Amino acid sequence: MMSGRTDEELKGVTLLGNQSVKYQYQYNPDILESFGNKHPENDYFVKLNFPEFTSLCPKTGQPDFAAIYISYVPDKLLVESKSLKLYLFSFRNQGDFHEDCINIIMKDLIRLMDPKYIEVWGKFTPRGGISIDPYCNHGKKGTKWETMAEKRIQWHDMNPENINNR
């Protein structure tokens, strides 16, 4: 098979192509895997969309559903997408508020990859007639990405979308 990556470069990628992987429904950040960025000199965004996120309300135990949007500018590492999918599924029985889930996801990805810039946005379906859409971001300290994060949070959602009850 043709590959632009060597076996050495792929040795940390263990979940992709592994058909015997079991889904975990308890929060587990150790599922996350990364691989090397072949283009660290380039600034580029990677956007990952996960429309089937579920977690539990920490008070009532009722399920919460959301679409999660992750955008990041990689530095030396990228997140492997199957591990990200399994990681996000691991929130299934996690009791946390929407805002907590989004911040936990961002912090876990920062620990994994140390990206130049990252933002995570959750668009949760309404409960009690209110939809909650938390957003968080982070730019690497002492770089232009720190400034970008400050600007993005200041200007976040200045042109809100029409809400149609999703």
Swiss-Prot record:
Q: Which UniProt keywords apply?
A: Cytoplasm, NADP, Oxidoreductase, Queuosine biosynthesis
Name the pathway.
Answer: tRNA modification; tRNA-queuosine biosynthesis
Indicate where this protein is primarily found.
cytoplasm
According to its UniProt record, the EC number is 1.7.1.13
Q: Known catalysed reaction(s)?
A: 7-aminomethyl-7-carbaguanine + 2 NADP(+) = 7-cyano-7-deazaguanine + 2 NADPH + 3 H(+)
Q: Which GO terms describe its cellular component?
A: cytoplasm
The active site annotation covers 57 (thioimide intermediate), 64 (proton donor)
Protein biosynthesis as UniProt keyword:
no
Compartments in which it is found = Cytoplasm
The answer, when asked if Cytoplasm is one of the entry's keywords, is yes
Example GO biological process term? tRNA modification
Q: Which residues bind substrate?
A: 79-81, 98-99
**UniProt-listed Gene3D superfamilies:** 3.30.1130.10
The family database entries (HAMAP family) matched by this protein are listed as: QueF_type1
Q: Which family does it belong to?
A: Belongs to the GTP cyclohydrolase I family. QueF type 1 subfamily.
**Which named protein is this?**
NADPH-dependent 7-cyano-7-deazaguanine reductase
- Classification lineage: Bacteria, Bacillati, Bacillota, Clostridia, Peptostreptococcales
